[in-house]
Amino acid sequence: MIEADRLIAPENPAFRDEDVIDRAIRPKKLADYQGQDHVRDQMEIFIKAAQLRSEALDHLLIFGPPGLGKTTLANIVANEMEVNIRTTSGPVLEKAGDLAALLTNLEENDVLFIDEIHRLSPMVEEVLYPAMEDYQLDIMIGEGPAARSIKIDLPPFTLIGATTRAGSLTSPLRDRFGITQRLEYYKVQDLQNIVQRSADCLGLSMEPEGALEVARRARGTPRIANRLLRRVRDYAEVKGNGHICADVADKALNMLDVDAQGFDYMDRKLLLAIMEKFGGGPVGLDNMAAAIGEEKDTIEDVLEPYLIQQGYLQRTPRGRIATDRAYLHFGIEK
C-alpha cells in the first residue's frame, strides 16, 4: 500500500536495512534516554529497588504510538539490570511450544521482550499466565486419554510487553503487568537533542539550528527524526560539503515533501479529502479509506494519531471532522 512508501511512516519496511544504524545510535542507559521524563524517573526507582532486593524487575507493559522507543526502553531496562534480553514478537509465537522454548532458556532475572504483544494467540497467552504469576510452565505431554500435564519451574524473569494497542490486550494479560508505562509524542526540544546526539554518533557536522529544523518536522517521533536526519545527510553530502545547517536541512526536507508541520503527501491527502470531498466532515472511516485509497488500520494507527494530537482532526461518534486549524493550514475557507 501507499504507507510503505512514506518517508515519515513510523513503521516502514522499506527502511529495515537502516535498523543497524538505528541500533548503533540508540541510548544504552537511562542517563542517555532523552525525553519521557516521567518514564525515566519512575523506571530508575523501580530498577534500583529491584537491584537492592536482588529480584527480577516486575513485569512491564510499554504502550504508545509507533516509533517512540518501546524497544529502546526494553533494552535499556536489561542493560540497567545487567541481565540478558531475549526478543520476539506476538505474531512469531504461533504455538505454546514456541513460548515454552524461550521461557525455559531464560536465566535468573533475564528479560523476555515481546513486541506487538496484543497479537499473541489465546493458546500462547494461556501459557503465559502461570509463567508471569508463579514462574511456572504448564505443559501437556501426550495426546488423548494418555495426555497429562506437567509443571516446570522457571527462574524469576521480567516480561516486557510492547504494543501500540493497549486496549486490544485482554484484561487477564494486562492485569498481570506490575508496571505500565505510556510513551508520549516527544517535545521538539527533546527531539532536537536526539537528532544532535545521533548526528554526533554518525560523525556528522551539524549545527543546532539544523537539528532543530529536523526535529520540528519529525512528528514528535524519534524514529522519524533519525530517518529524516539520514536523508538530510545524503542531501548535504551531494548538494553541499556535508555540513548541515538550518538552510540545508530546510531545503532537504522540502525536497522530501515534508512540510513545516511534519506532514507529507498522505497527511495532506487525508485532510484535503475531508475538507474538499466531504465538506469538512463528519465522514466515516470506510468512506475515508476509499477516498484516499488506504487501509483502515493504517489510517487509524498511523495517520490519524498525530493529526488528532496536533489538533487538525477530530474523531466523533458520527465520523472524522477537519478542524479550523486544518482549514487555516491549507488556506481554505470553511
From Swiss-Prot:
It holds the Pfam family RuvB_C. Its EC number is 3.6.4.-. One of its GO terms (biological process) is DNA repair. Homohexamer. Forms an RuvA(8)-RuvB(12)-Holliday junction (HJ) complex. HJ DNA is sandwiched between 2 RuvA tetramers; dsDNA enters through RuvA and exits via RuvB. An RuvB hexamer assembles on each DNA strand where it exits the tetramer. Each RuvB hexamer is contacted by two RuvA subunits (via domain III) on 2 adjacent RuvB subunits; this complex drives branch migration. In the full resolvosome a probable DNA-RuvA(4)-RuvB(12)-RuvC(2) complex forms which resolves the HJ. The lineage of its organism: Bacteria, Pseudomonadati, Pseudomonadota, Gammaproteobacteria, Vibrionales. It is an enzyme of class 3 (hydrolase). Residues 4-186 are annotated as: Large ATPase domain (RuvB-L). NCBIfam families: PRK00080.1 (NF000868), ruvB (TIGR00635). One of its GO terms (molecular function) is four-way junction helicase activity. The RuvA-RuvB-RuvC complex processes Holliday junction (HJ) DNA during genetic recombination and DNA repair, while the RuvA-RuvB complex plays an important role in the rescue of blocked DNA replication forks via replication fork reversal (RFR). RuvA specifically binds to HJ cruciform DNA, conferring on it an open structure. The RuvB hexamer acts as an ATP-dependent pump, pulling dsDNA into and through the RuvAB complex. RuvB forms 2 homohexamers on either side of HJ DNA bound by 1 or 2 RuvA tetramers; 4 subunits per hexamer contact DNA at a time. DNA binds at residues 315, 320. Has 3 domains, the large (RuvB-L) and small ATPase (RuvB-S) domains and the C-terminal head (RuvB-H) domain. The head domain binds DNA, while the ATPase domains jointly bind ATP, ADP or are empty depending on the state of the subunit in the translocation cycle. During a single DNA translocation step the structure of each domain remains the same, but their relative positions change. Disulfide bonds: none annotated. Belongs to the RuvB family. One of its GO terms (cellular component) is cytoplasm. It catalyses: ATP + H2O = ADP + phosphate + H(+). Mg(2+) binds at residue 71. This is Holliday junction branch migration complex subunit RuvB. It is found in: Cytoplasm. ATP binds at residues 25-26, 67, 70-72, 133-135, 176, 186, 223. Residues 260-334 are annotated as: Head domain (RuvB-H).
